[in-house]
Amino acid sequence: MKTCLIVDDSRVIRKVSRRILEDLGFEVAEACDGVEAMAWCRAMMPDAILLDWLMPVMDGLEFVRQLRGETGGDAPKVIFCSSETAIERIREALDAGADEYIMKPFDGAIVAGKLGALGLLQERSA
């Protein structure tokens, strides 16, 4: 089973994201900021990371930059999930090492589309 780490300071966003990802067949872990997420990644690198931009302690941009410098940190597919809509900000996230970008609010179809495009969705039998 593929793993996804949800990194967001909003408990509500983490809960909604968890439901979507579990429905897609992922094992899910949660972190409320970049520091907690980095500790989790150092212990067990996930297959995917759903990452908020604006968080206390360490924001998403700093997290992805640090992640990509870690041993094995190039492996996870990082999807930024943010209310930042300016093209310059999206480009900044992708240049920092993110693989995809989703604008909030999002739904299951949007998340599934991005994960599928990144090759992370497994065929599931009914």
What are these regions (language model features)?
Residues 33-36, 59-65:
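Acidic catalytic/metal-coordinating carboxylates
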Residues 15-23:
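Charged docking surfaces used in two-component/phosphorelay signaling
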Residues 62, 85-100, 113:
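Alpha4 helix (beta4-alpha4-beta5 surface) of REC/receiver domains from two-component response regulators
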Residues 30-48:
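Acidic, metal-coordinating helix/loop segments flanking the phosphotransfer/catalytic sites
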Residues 55:
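Receiver (REC) domain active-site loop signature in two-component systems and cognate sites
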Residues 106-115:
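C-terminal output helix
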Residues 31-35, 90, 108:
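Conserved Asp/Asn-Gly motif in the active-site loop of CheY-like receiver
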